[in-house]
Amino acid sequence: MASKKVCIVGSGNWGSAIAKIVGGNAAQLAQFDPRVTMWVFEEDIGGKKLTEIINTQHENVKYLPGHKLPPNVVAVPDVVQAAADADILIFVVPHQFIGKICDQLKGHLKANATGISLIKGVDEGPNGLKLISEVIGEHLGIPMSVLMGANIASEVADEKFCETTIGCKDPAQGQLLKELMQTPNFRITVVQEVDTVEICGALKNVVAVGAGFCDGLGFGDNTKAAVIRLGLMEMIAFAKLFRSGPVSSATFLESCGVADLITTCYGGRNRKVAEAFARTGKSIEQLEKELLNGQKLQGPETARELHSILQHKGLVDKFPLFMAVYKVCYEGQPVGEFIRCLQNHPEHM
């Protein structure tokens, strides 16, 4: 069997952390081509191109400083060139940009290429919810899997132990992806319920914004635990409403579900920015620049898409926590009123 060529589409914080793992495994395992391409959105860093820095210093000095990438990971500034020969495409870019990237890649991929999305977000489709893996799969005509879990990028790059979940309908492909990405400290469970895995990954960012509001307003651990639990209830209810396939509670107990929700509500960037938003009154855009090096926040954007989907279906009242996050972020509702969505939650009625 010819060795599989791998391309990582994206090179931010999470993309670079995954490149470290994938590059290391591809160099050692016969089933993969050792040369891993990584598409890098070209930027100028102190008069040098970011791709040149990565290819000479083997470090993404902007998005994952202090971590060496394997020398077999090659940064490529042209996405079509990076992906042209790939058998496996790993998508890891902010979900706002995926449509444009797919437009560029369309018609330029290998006939039997497959993809895996690490992107946490949802899109609006004609029938309401559209998952990012569906957007990619339909645009490019390739089968898609997903990887979601309690994986804060800096900790993964530090090789601290964590778990993750791959959702893949084809068991053989799931096993291949596990071989490509598993390490002693990055442990993978493969499940077949792809949709539920991906919904968990998208919706937890909205809950984390609520958790950050909680922290910024000075509420305690009990309140935050309530945000996490009520958020999980809304995630499960949303999945059951919008997915045609099975939605089992067991999937919510995998790393992609409750574990990712907990870590994001305590350690993720959505929580951090939401806390600063509640404390300072600065805009989300301003805080992205100050706290995230200009990287985009997924939680508020996902809340906006959820609002549109739920409004279309007349179900806004059934998801008070999701909608409270939307109202604070986009409709100018005072953040101090966030607690009301908890006090009047239908779970207690």
Curated annotation (Swiss-Prot):
One GO biological process term: cellular response to tumor necrosis factor
Entry's localization field: Cytoplasm
Binding site for substrate: K120, R269, N270
Residues recorded with modification N6-succinyllysine: K289
Sequence positions bearing Phosphoserine: S154
Chief localisation class: cytoplasm
Catalyses which reaction(s): sn-glycerol 3-phosphate + NAD(+) = dihydroxyacetone phosphate + NADH + H(+)
Binding site for NAD(+): G10, S11, G12, N13, W14, G15, A153, R269, K296, Q298
Pfam hit, one: NAD_Gly3P_dh_C
Matching InterPro entries: 6-PGluconate_DH-like_C_sf (IPR008927), 6PGD_dom2 (IPR013328), G3P_DH_NAD-dep (IPR006168), G3P_DH_NAD-dep_C (IPR006109), G3P_DH_NAD-dep_euk (IPR017751), G3P_DH_NAD-dep_N (IPR011128), NAD(P)-bd_dom_sf (IPR036291)
Keywords: Cytoplasm, NAD, Oxidoreductase, Phosphoprotein
Family: Belongs to the NAD-dependent glycerol-3-phosphate dehydrogenase family.
Job of this protein: Has glycerol-3-phosphate dehydrogenase activity.
Oligomer and partners: Homodimer.
Protein name: Glycerol-3-phosphate dehydrogenase [NAD(+)], cytoplasmic
Organism, as annotated: Pongo abelii
